[in-house]
């Protein structure tokens, strides 16, 4: 199976993640930071979606019945818990090896996720639309951020939500997300990130608005070294997440 192509696909990035595809679910491996980050982004999506739809975020399946596409799903580290919250999840990734890993893990776990080796461009071109569109830790890895975000926004139904998480382009993010995380602490494989591809909140907001959505929230995420945990915060100098809405028709 060959990897799909498209204007947002950076072949070098796809190849980099394919090389470590077998480690997606190894919580002590190259993806360990993502696993520690997962509770924060999962809660952010759940809580915002529940506020938007008037649901109880602490209910057994708070996202029940909502369609969701996880763009750049990798091995399914976020897709699976979103499906456990009741969402009807479609996971997209341009790396076929990632999709094979994701499918195998979901089948073993008994979690229903529709994984596809596709791009968001092909899904939008086919006319599919979703209640929730998720692009977490993706926009800093695509070839054309603005084009990618506009296409992702096109997948949002009227009244739906778009979520993104990425890294701000600041000197602090260079020091922490690249020098610290990749070279000093070894949390991530060297070369995982390119500082010049980091995205400021203002740049991301402009791309979202050009796609017809309105930014509803921007929240920072900070790491606490003593506890080893991440939490939502006002500080957006390094990691941050956004929620955007498409007005109801």
From Swiss-Prot:
Keywords: Methyltransferase, S-adenosyl-L-methionine, Transferase, Ubiquinone biosynthesis. The lineage of its organism: Bacteria, Pseudomonadati, Pseudomonadota, Alphaproteobacteria, Hyphomicrobiales. O-methyltransferase that catalyzes the 2 O-methylation steps in the ubiquinone biosynthetic pathway. The keyword Plastid does not apply. The keyword Transcription does not apply. HAMAP family: UbiG (MF_00472). It is an enzyme of class 2 (transferase). CDD domains: AdoMet_MTases. It comes from Methylobacterium sp. (strain 4-46). Its EC number is 2.1.1.222, 2.1.1.64. S-adenosyl-L-methionine binds at residues 41, 72, 93, 136. This is Ubiquinone biosynthesis O-methyltransferase. Belongs to the methyltransferase superfamily. UbiG/COQ3 family. GO terms for biological process: methylation. InterPro entries: SAM-dependent_MTases_sf (IPR029063), UbiG_MeTrfase (IPR010233). Pathway: Cofactor biosynthesis; ubiquinone biosynthesis. It catalyses: a 3-demethylubiquinol + S-adenosyl-L-methionine = a ubiquinol + S-adenosyl-L-homocysteine + H(+); a 3-(all-trans-polyprenyl)benzene-1,2-diol + S-adenosyl-L-methionine = a 2-methoxy-6-(all-trans-polyprenyl)phenol + S-adenosyl-L-homocysteine + H(+). Transmembrane segments: none annotated.
């Amino acid at each position: 199976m060959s990897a799909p192509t498209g204007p947002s696909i950076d072949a070098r990035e796809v190849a980099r993640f394919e090389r470590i595809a077998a480690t997606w679910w190894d919580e002590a491996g190259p993806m360990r930071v993502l696993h520690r980050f997962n509770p924060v982004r999962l809660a952010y999506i759940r809580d915002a979606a529940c506020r938007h739809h008037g649901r109880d975020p602490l209910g057994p399946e708070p996202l029940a019945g909502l369609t969701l596409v996880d763009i750049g799903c990798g091995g399914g580290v976020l897709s699976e818990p979103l499906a456990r919250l009741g969402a009807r999840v479609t996971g997209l990734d341009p790396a076929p090896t990632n999709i094979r890993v994701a499918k195998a893990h979901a089948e073993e776990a008994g979690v229903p996720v529709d994984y596809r080796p596709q791009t968001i461009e092909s899904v939008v071109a086919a006319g599919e639309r979703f209640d929730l569109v998720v692009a977490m830790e993706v926009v800093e890895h695509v070839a054309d951020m603005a084009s990618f975000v506009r296409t992702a926004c096109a997948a949002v139904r009227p009244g739906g939500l778009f979520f993104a998480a990425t890294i701000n382009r600041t000197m602090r993010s260079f020091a922490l997300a690249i020098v610290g995380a990749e070279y000093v602490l070894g949390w991530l494989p060297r070369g995982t990130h390119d500082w010049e591809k980091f995205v400021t909140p203002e740049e991301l907001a402009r791309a979202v608005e050009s796609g017809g959505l309105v930014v509803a929230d921007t929240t920072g995420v900070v790491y606490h070294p003593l506890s080893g945990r991440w939490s939502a915060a006002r500080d957006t100098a390094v990691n941050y997440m956004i929620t955007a809405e498409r007005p109801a028709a």
